[in-house]
Amino acid sequence: MEGGLSAPLSVRLLLFIALPAAGWLTTNAPRPPSTAPQNGIQINVTTLSKSGEESEEQVVLNITYERGQVYVNDLPVNSGVTRISCQTLIVKSENLEKLEEKHYFGIVTVRILVLERPVTYSASSQLIVIQGEVVEIDGRQAQQKNVTEIDILVKNQRVLRYSSYFLPLEESMLYSISQDSDILFTLPDFSKKGTVSSLQTTSHYLMGNVETTVDGNALPGKLPETPLRAEPPSSYKVMCQWMEKLRKALCRFWSSVVPVLFMFLDVMVVGVLGAAGVIAVLKLLFPVCENKGILQVDKMNGISVPIILYPDGSEKTAQKLTDKTDI
């Protein structure tokens, strides 16, 4: 009887686990709301509607690092402050008393700061710091109190550690950088995972505030190229790029030289102090009885000889003395 009862119980447990999963697969019912992705961040913002009502919303961004490139929602972001507009998941709190949430996708304008810092204890490692600030949500101004900062420790383009924490917006580096220097990202539908079709003719570039257009010539059998946006050649930009490369080279050089220099100084200091200590101990254990190289006058036998000194230039007195001795 016990074996007959245990079999239906196990079947019931199996059906209890399998039926909800089968229902999610066969029906169009959405899955339970999940948290941010593994490499994602949640930014709490406050938006103001046209009627003047404030609403609390949460923007979910997926930030990844792959082969030396930082991606925000699959959009490539370079070092500096980049302003991008992309579609992302937004969680809106409709009823605070019942804790009701509404999930939808909207167009979000975000400022992303990416900094690359060398690590002192390893020349091949670097720390990538990422900060994000939401500017607009579907054309509505957004405000936030805190900034989520992500620190990615990378060695040879391989992620070693991924950490994130919150800090006040006024204390962040992103807040201190003027929005006029932001790099504008054009054509936000570009994705690193998407395939470019044969009829797609528009290219995607990271653009600055000053933009020019370059006309493309149509090839036989293909659609004409859309005018491309490009930055005019500038000696200042080339100089900045060269200085940035020089700065990175100097950082790598000093990160490899400074540890060796400190090790050398440690060896020198320890050697000098150790030698002084050994000499002091030897002096205490084996003191010197007498000093060598000093003539001892007590042990010498001497005979005193009288010496008569004559004044200089007195020949007459000398002759008188000789005469007296003759008499």
From Swiss-Prot:
Residues 24-259 are extracellular. It comes from the Eukaryota. The keyword Mitochondrion does not apply. Residues 1-23 form the signal peptide. GO terms for cellular component: membrane. The chain crosses the membrane at residues 260-280. Glycans are attached at residues 44, 62, 146. It is a single-pass type I membrane protein. The keyword DNA-binding does not apply. InterPro entries: GINM1. Keywords: Glycoprotein, Membrane, Signal, Transmembrane, Transmembrane helix. Residues 281-327 are cytoplasmic. It is found in: Membrane. This is Glycoprotein integral membrane protein 1. The gene is Ginm1.
